[in-house]
Amino acid sequence: MIIVTGGAGFIGSNIVKALNDKGITDILVVDNLKDGTKFVNLVDLNIADYMDKEDFLIQIMAGEEFGEIEAIFHEGACSSTTEWDGKYMMDNNYQYSKELLHYCLEREIPFLYASSAATYGGRTSDFIESREYEQPLNVYGYSKFLFDEYVRQILPEANSQIVGFRYFNVYGPREGHKGSMASVAFHLNTQLNNGESPKLFEGSDGFKRDFVYVGDVADVNLWFWENGVSGIFNLGTGRAESFQAVADATLAFHKKGSIEYIPFPDKLKGRYQAFTQADLTNLRKAGYDKPFKTVAEGVTEYMAWLNRDA
């Protein structure tokens, strides 16, 4: 069996899909369906079982067995970069992850988990997986950074696989439940379909992020599991592209609309990553050599998926 925490969420459900595409269906999805809209991410997928996150954590802490586990993909977390409840964030992202990690280490189960580019904070260069480059801007980034630091202490002694992926700006299918935290591409598409002018912040040609397609993210996860490589790795494309490029690809698909530029909100000033670009040196050294989709390629594929029933 394979366990995917956060399996009804954005990246988790895409990992379930990638496993299904390889003929793997013996999957336990762990999630919190308090947000009932997330179930739509699972309706076209094949899984063996579902468990609530709280029940799962109780069983993990009690050391209960789930049968033979081939791997745990730990994608379950509070991923809101605007959540400032530090206790909630640390319980959800740090303590929960530690419990799962030790469960896996004791049983030599491969443990693949979601870290984040938020660990780098407001940098504009050198997004490198090393302590001197890490200075998170928000409590979400701090919770991810702290767990990475914890993993770094354990990695040299570990007898089983531990791998963390620092996701950059992931976009693509199955993110609709994320609301305001969904990608720019998702929001632009919604605005166009509602007959509204698609909106970007003023200066969006100057805001550049490493936008990575979720299908590529799932592919990297599975490759590392299949190849048993451990470590903490950036997971982006290695290219910074502008929000304007995302908008251009969206408009090109729809063949209509023009962008309305809105003022940059005061509440985000100083807490907003204006530039991200993954350094892929370590990922490539580990042996992953496949190309990543450009914004034009990924957004076009995503638009086709979003508008498949239109």
From Swiss-Prot:
Residues reported to bind NADP(+): 10-11, 31-32, 38, 53, 75-79, 92, 144, 170, 178
EC number(s) stated in the UniProt entry for this protein: 5.1.3.20
BP GO terms, sorted: ADP-L-glycero-beta-D-manno-heptose biosynthetic process; carbohydrate metabolic process
Cofactor: binding comment: Binds 1 NADP(+) per subunit.
Free-text domain note: Contains a large N-terminal NADP-binding domain, and a smaller C-terminal substrate-binding domain.
Cross-referenced NCBIfam families: heptose_epim, PRK11150.1
Protein name: ADP-L-glycero-D-manno-heptose-6-epimerase
